[in-house]
Amino acid sequence: NTGGKAPRKHIAHKQAKKSSAAAATGGVKKPHRFRPGTVALREIRRFQKSTELLIRKLPFQRLVREIASEFKNDLRFQSSAVLALQEASEAYLVGLFEDTNLCAIHAKRVTIMP
């Protein structure tokens, strides 16, 4: 014995079981699903690599104008000013979520709560 695993048996039996299951459902293969959390981790890695803005520009611009209109009507903004506000806002939110996540981990939780 070389310590390796023994060859698997009943391969034909497993294949028959698979084909009968497919025949029972009418040959419709159910769509592939990832385990819970796998897609979330993949998205976290993707967004941590990227540097682009995550909030859409026009909705953010409307929000800025709405908030500014409470102080003074008919204010005008340079496009670079709105972009600077968006960069700062997203940086603040990312930092806030990082701190929130650390608090959740400290409390032995995974989910962040409001």
UniProtKB/Swiss-Prot annotation:
Question: Which of UniProt's keywords are assigned here?
Answer: Chromosome, DNA-binding, Nucleosome core, Nucleus
A Gene Ontology molecular function term of the record: structural constituent of chromatin
Record keyword DNA-binding present: yes
Where composition is biased (Low complexity), the residues are 18-28
Q: Where is the composition biased (Basic residues)?
A: 1-17
Q: For the region Disordered, give the residue spans.
A: 1-32
SMART domains in the cross-refs = H3 (SM00428)
Membrane-crossing residue ranges in chain numbering: none
Q: Which GO terms describe its cellular component?
A: nucleosome; nucleus
Localization (cell): Nucleus; Chromosome
- Relate the protein's function as given in its record: Core component of nucleosome. Nucleosomes wrap and compact DNA into chromatin, limiting DNA accessibility to the cellular machineries which require DNA as a template. Histones thereby play a central role in transcription regulation, DNA repair, DNA replication and chromosomal stability. DNA accessibility is regulated via a complex set of post-translational modifications of histones, also called histone code, and nucleosome remodeling.
User: Which PANTHER family does the UniProt record give?
Assistant: HISTONE H3 (PTHR11426)
Q: What is the annotated quaternary arrangement, including any partners?
A: The nucleosome is a histone octamer containing two molecules each of H2A, H2B, H3 and H4 assembled in one H3-H4 heterotetramer and two H2A-H2B heterodimers. The octamer wraps approximately 147 bp of DNA.
Q: Which family does it belong to?
A: Belongs to the histone H3 family.
> What protein is this chain from?
Histone H3-3
Which species is listed as the source?
A: Stylonychia lemnae
